[in-house]
Amino acid sequence: MYDINKVRADFPILSRTVYDRPLVYLDNGATTQKPLCVLDAMREEYLNANANVHRGVHYLSQRATDLHEAARETVRQFINAPKTEEIIFTRGTTESINLVAASFCEAFMAEGDEVIVSVMEHHSNIVPWQLQAAKRGIALKVIPMDDSGKLDMQVYEQLFSEKTKIVSVAHVSNTLGTVNPVKEIVRIAHEHGVPVLVDGAQSTPHFAVDVQSIDCDFFAFSGHKIYGPTGIGVLYGKEEWLDRMPPYQGGGEMIESVSFEKTTFEKLPFKFEAGTPDYVATHGLATALNYVSALGMDNIAAHERELTDYCMARLAEIDGMRLFGTTEGKDAVVSFLVGDIHHLDMGTLLDRLGIAVRTGHHCAQPVMDRFGIQGTVRASFGLYNTKEEVDALVAGVKRVSQMF
């Protein structure tokens, strides 16, 4: 286990106050804070190695290119992908899923074909498929879940038909914290000859991910949720699929040759990386991945699950408490309501106590519909959170509850 005080010292923002109270930051599911090493690495590149990548023979361009491609290799190692060519840089998980939805559907799907998703998906893993459904006449099938937030795997198996072309599911629910059995989901899909995209936005920051062990065909995650910069994300895809998928966008760098008669495209991964990439952000992402790797993903997972269990137990002591997402082994997310108190009121008053949580539907309205509610209060943990901060949350919830 790591020294939590030393870790917190790496994040300057955690020492600030809000409304003259110590900041208790429990909104890591939305975005994480950044360690000094990430901020310093990005500043250093802008100061001393800022130039466009893949486009210049001069020193600065070569240096920036080396850092950018080294970041790709860092990502490959972090998720244990077989090849660097299978690592595509995007703007985030949302763009990664949109890329797959648009390109895969163009290559492999026709009117009447089907996509399987789950009821607990983030809107970013629903809307891209709906856009394709409206354009191409394909259909979405939905895996239901029980009252604890666990997917119904029996129904999942029954959803497959000869029209099923892809499955796209969250590794971890951003609202419930449910850790889905993605290896089993992939195994079943592959028995039907169907590829699987895994949304790893809420898993990659919290425990070790091995895409070869999962055997998923696509995997997406975001930099800003794993202590890296905003605006950078990753799509891993098996070469056998990516090679057969058309480019998602057109522009510079993704071409091999251009004439007014015909354009030919670059090989992987550049075929899917049109335009100037955010090469400073890729360096920042790599620095963040090295930071969490040094702490140990198993250590981070153990720390955060201890916090999650502790928070669930403490909140359950409060009269009128309703906890959403109660599956065993859930990860780093606690969603709740208290009595008839509106989630926005609870979140607003907690904020006045210096406690940052998220309120609302968390970009997962079908989850709210499943439980017959409009929204929840969500506390989500990161590697720097403490039991004392959980205690502050519990005390804050009790104090707010007494106002109603």
Q: Whereabouts are the PLM-identified features?
A:
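Pyridoxal 5′-phosphate
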Residues: 1-404
